[in-house]
């Protein structure tokens, strides 16, 4: 049986549940059941690569087989094919859990992928699910709490999720209820399915070594040439999903790389909103873009301080390395490093606290609701409709060309730009790079694309060095205030060296821009 599943999932903590219990949606009659699910795939993970998951779960005394599709681009709805196994296929001589019933998959997208292939268990999910129903704006919503564990090989990962699933009515009611719940606890949408998490854990379990961790599910550029709106949905939805996963990881581990990846995801979302603006801009577009930028800005201070800490830890020029031979300089450096670490911890605490405020989770939900509603597809603007029907290559090529012209026009004046203007140029370079990565597939020019991206990366890195140098005096003085008299000597040296190194950094950036000018665009 084919169904369409529409749901919102949230990662929660025990403290969140205590706060949420005051809401009527979690205060009514409930049922509880233990659900043990086994997920199957071919040895080469053909279903995973196709964005499908095949599950066997024990429900009400019988096995139910469910094939789920991935999330549609920019949509919370997922197709699923359910089949109750009356006479489950079993391996001869074995009385353990059944194997998937292949005949029930005959008319599904999985059929050609598993034909002639052996199916084996990839991972299992064991949760206790508490369920209740709630009415919101005329819709019936199932409110479920899953508490349990995900297992793959020798690895385990805890599960504690709140799930809102629309059983009937308007999907907008899901967001109305979610925003109401977010007033009580910092709900953060989880756009990665349990199956995706299971596959990541299974990949980690297949690795060796003591530091195995679930792998990040890397974004891959569009492999085909989808329609313009589908491409936008895929890029924006993935960027938002990466943002939510990176925040959960940042809360748990407070890693600098995670902080960086979260900022990258938000910048990529902003780049997609601007790049596809002529096709999707509506009355909410500016508000959605502002919400994404607000989330990114909450991380800026912590990232800036981390980059400064890395510079000081590694040394900042020959003068600093020579000064470390003197005892006074070594003590000054140690005091300064301690101060910068305290500054970084405080900035990260402030950022995480800001994400725990209702405004942050509501901002993410506003973006998600806008993507799900896709009101731009119902526009009466003839020009916008025409842009939406263009092939991706026809839509994106002039946009890439315009971005490139702007980058080079400003880059030609690099030496006369202020630090803030150079930073704006770097943001333009990033937008061009993200667009080139995400939308290069329709042009089928891998060599030219690679050379163009390499040139862009060099410009971005060179401008990044300039940005770091410009920020050094301010950060050095702040660190000196935090460190006290011990850190003043080295802070002054750091500020002076940053100023002295700027001319050489400017020359490197100018050379990188000249190389970009000669890099042949892949879209012409």
Regions found by a protein language model. Name each.
Residues 1-524:
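Cationic, histidine-enriched alpha-helical/coil surfaces that engage anionic ligands
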């Amino acid at each position: 049986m084919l169904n369409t599943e529409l749901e919102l999932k949230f990662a929660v903590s025990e403290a969140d549940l205590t706060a949420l219990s005051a809401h009527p949606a979690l205060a009514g009659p409930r049922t509880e059941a233990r659900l043990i699910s086994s997920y199957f795939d071919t040895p080469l993970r053909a279903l995973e690569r196709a964005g499908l998951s095949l599950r066997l779960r024990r429900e009400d005394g019988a096995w139910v087989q469910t094939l789920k599709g991935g999330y549609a681009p920019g949509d919370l709805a997922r197709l699923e094919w359910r089949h109750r196994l009356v006479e489950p296929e079993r391996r001869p001589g074995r009385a353990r859990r059944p194997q998937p019933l292949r005949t029930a998959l005959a008319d599904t997208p999985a059929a050609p992928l598993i034909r002639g292939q052996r199916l084996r268990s990839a991972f299992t999910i064991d949760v206790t699910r508490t369920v209740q129903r709630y009415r919101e704006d005329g819709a019936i919503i199932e409110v479920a709490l899953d508490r349990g564990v995900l297992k793959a090989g020798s690895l385990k990962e805890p599960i504690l999720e709140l799930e809102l699933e629309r059983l009937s009515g308007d999907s907008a009611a899901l967001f109305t209820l979610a925003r109401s719940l977010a007033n009580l606890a910092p709900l953060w949408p989880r756009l990665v399915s349990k199956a995706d998490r299971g596959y990541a854990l299974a990949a980690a379990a297949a690795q060796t070594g003591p530091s195995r961790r679930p792998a990040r599910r890397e974004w891959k550029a569009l492999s085909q040439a989808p329609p313009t709106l589908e491409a936008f949905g895929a890029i924006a939805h993935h960027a938002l999903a990466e943002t939510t996963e990176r925040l959960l990881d940042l809360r748990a581990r407070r890693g600098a790389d995670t902080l960086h990846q979260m900022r990258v995801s938000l910048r990529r979302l902003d780049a997609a909103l601007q790049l596809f603006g002529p096709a999707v801009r509506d009355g909410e577009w500016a508000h959605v873009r502002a919400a994404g930028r607000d989330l990114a800005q909450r991380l800026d201070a912590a990232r800036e301080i981390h980059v400064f800490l890395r510079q000081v830890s590694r040394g900042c020029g020959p003068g600093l390395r020579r000064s470390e031979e003197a005892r006074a300089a070594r003590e000054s450096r140690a005091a300064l490093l301690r101060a910068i670490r305290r500054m970084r911890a405080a900035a990260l605490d402030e950022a995480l606290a800001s994400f725990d405020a209702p405004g942050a989770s509501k901002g993410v939900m506003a973006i998600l609701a806008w993507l799900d509603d896709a009101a731009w597809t119902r526009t009466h603007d003839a020009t916008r409709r025409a842009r939406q029907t263009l092939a991706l290559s026809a839509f994106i090529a002039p946009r890439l060309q315009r971005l490139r012209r702007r980058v080079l026009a400003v880059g030609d004046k690099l030496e006369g730009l202020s630090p803030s203007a150079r930073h704006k140029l770097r943001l333009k370079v990033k937008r061009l790079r993200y667009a080139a990565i995400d939308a290069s597939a329709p042009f089928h020019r891998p060599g030219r694309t690679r050379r163009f991206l390499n040139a862009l990366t060099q410009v971005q890195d060179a401008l990044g060095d300039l940005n770091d140098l410009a920020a050094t005096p301010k950060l050095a003085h702040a660190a000196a205030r935090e460190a006290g008299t011990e850190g003043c000597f080295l802070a002054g040296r750091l500020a002076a060296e940053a100023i002295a190194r700027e001319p050489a950094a400017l020359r490197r950036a100018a050379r990188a821009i000249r190389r970009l000018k000669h890099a042949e665009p892949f879209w012409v």
